[in-house]
Amino acid sequence: MAVKWTGGHSSSILCLNANKDGLVASGGEGGDLVAWGEDGTPLGHMQLEGADDVTSVLFSASCPTKLYASHGETISVLDVRSLKGSLDHFHVNEEEINCLSLNETESLLASADDSGAIKILDLEKKKVTRSLKRHSNICSSVAFRPQRPQSLVSCGLDMQVMLWSLQKARPVWITNLQEDETEETEGPQTPGRLLNPALAHSVSVASCGNIFSCGAEDGKVRIFRVMGVKCERELGFKGHTLGVSQVCFLPESSLLLTGGNDGRIRLWDVSGKMEKLQKSPARHIHRKKAKRAACPTQGGNSRAPGAEDEGHAKILPKLDIEHGEKVNWLLSTKIKGNKSILVADQTSCVSVYPLNEL
């Protein structure tokens, strides 16, 4: 059962983040921003100027009281100890920002917006040093790669996933999830079965910096490995019966949290499955065969947690939570020293699930 944190918001919570001291920030509709203590007590509240939805919140790792929040086309810099006004603000995006990401050295802040652009803000110079424009639709998610402060991945509603190098200011690798999907689903289709387009909603990079995941509207979770300036898809499986709204690697781990519009939260160990595929001499043959395979057996049964991967083997979640609400944001952090999953959804509560057994 989840512990519910209440009393902070009056409408849907859209985003979450936590600092290393256990302080949690949540952003909601109408400009609402709340800071929470580890016991779930609201410590501070403010309404950001303009009353635009707060779409992303991000703590500084080097200065744990500093918080970046995106609302509308603006990024505000706040001190969570005193939520009375912003320390600084930047208006660098032309349309609503969807996601923020800091690089590991905290010299650069990326902001992805509805125009498909990603603005790279130099925090020392306080100016945009790069404007990355390649997505042809909303850029929904962006993430700097750990250990590689000049490299990032992004995804968007144009169904594209991109790897960027800031030295080049252009993507060094692009894949279209829908083309990928078309190849896989060649052959007989179930009559009357509609496939959701692979609109990409969320990306997350593992701590190693070389493995990243993407969640999409078709219910699939895809795992990629960066190989120099190219990426290879390592794994793809049907993780949810509706769109995957959130993917989130646990810190220093290959365990992946996913949340979906089906109201479920699942935890997957993707490393073991990738190792098996890599060791298999028939790996590429399996992939070709999988392209002719019918869709995973999970179908419309949300209680069948197994999902087929490209090699026809099933990948089973280590944890399967029937949360019951569409997931807006997922976060793995320590609360009072215990590993926990924090969930933002369509309600005004933050839900906290324990991860102690893992």
From Swiss-Prot:
Stated family: Belongs to the WD repeat WDR53 family.
Region (Disordered): 288-309
Stretches forming WD repeats: 8-47, 92-131, 134-174, 195-234, 239-278
UniProtKB keywords: Repeat, WD repeat
Gene: Wdr53
Residues forming coiled coils: none
Organism lineage: Eukaryota, Metazoa, Chordata, Craniata, Vertebrata
The keyword Chaperone is annotated on this UniProt entry: no
Pfam families in the record: WD40 (PF00400)
Name under which the protein is recorded: WD repeat-containing protein 53
Cystines in this chain: none
InterPro entries for the chain: WD40/YVTN_repeat-like_dom_sf, WD40_repeat_CS, WD40_repeat_dom_sf, WD40_rpt, WDR53
Tree of life domain: Eukaryota
Repeat keyword on record: yes
